[in-house]
Design a protein with these regions (language model features):
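Short, well-structured alpha-helical segments
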Residues: 20, 161, 173-181
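Active-site-flanking alpha-helical
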Residues: 23, 176, 202
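Alpha-helical secondary-structure segments
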Residues: 15-25
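Amphipathic alpha-helical segments that form the core helices of the histone-fold
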Residues: 1-9, 178-188
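An acidic, gly/pro-interrupted, aromatic-rich
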Residues: 9, 16, 29-167, 171-173, ...
Length: 211
């Protein structure tokens, strides 16, 4: 912090230069890639030689799913909106209605900070309700259907590739492509197979975690 403060003053209090210094630093660009030598010396990553893997918070998770499906409403400002249990609520989560006395269960499930108390840092929990929501939520199912609709013009392998590119910004690996094709061929009823594949992509660890 002292170094950044000195740089900030030396560069004429330029926020642009400060942000540039941060985002171009080696620390900011770290990934979760393992390094055998460093892992042996510092297995707990106390010295921060790699980025600690972390799960997306509720707002980032929900907005990412909406964005990938092509449904995210980017409108700014306006009244808050109840987003729990509404499959057609496409506004950014920051505009979700918060009842201080009765926090919606969706927010509690994904570790949203209590609005009626001071919270310096959110807790991160792993509980059964989280995957149950992702697998059974009408909201997630609606976004999966929308994702399939966006690649409806493509067929077979090309549709699978397009879904991976749209979701993960990459092509599927060979084994992923083979597994997806096998899943589509064997799923009953066939008409729902693509929706289920899309849902699996949307709720996978690659989507929910930052590496």
């Amino acid at each position: 912090l002292d170094h950044l403060a000195a740089e900030f003053v030396a560069n004429g209090w330029s926020m642009k230069q400060l942000i540039r210094s941060i985002v171009l630093s080696t620390t900011y660009q770290q990934g979760e890639t393992a390094h055998a030598e460093y892992a042996e010396r510092d297995p707990s990553n106390r010295l921060l030689w790699q980025m600690n893997r972390r799960r997306l918070d509720l707002e980032s998770m929900r907005d990412s799913v909406l964005a990938v499906a092509g449904n995210l409403d980017l409108k700014q400002s306006g009244r808050s909106e109840k987003i729990e249990n509404k499959s057609n609520a496409n506004r950014r989560t920051i505009y979700g209605f918060i009842d201080r006395q009765n926090l919606p269960s969706l927010f509690r499930t994904f570790d949203f900070a209590g609005p009626d108390t001071t919270c310096g840092r959110r807790f991160t929990t792993t509980i059964p309700q989280q995957p149950l929501y992702l697998l059974n939520s009408p909201f997630i199912e609606a976004q999966a259907k929308r994702l399939v609709e966006s690649v409806q013009a493509l067929k077979g392998e090309e549709r699978i590739r397009a879904m991976f590119r749209q979701t993960y910004q990459r092509d599927p690996k060979d084994w992923e492509l083979d597994s997806a094709e096998l899943f589509i061929d064997q799923f009953v009823p066939y008409a729902a197979a693509w929706d289920r594949l899309a849902q699996a992509l949307l709720v996978s660890n690659e989507m929910m975690f930052i590496d």
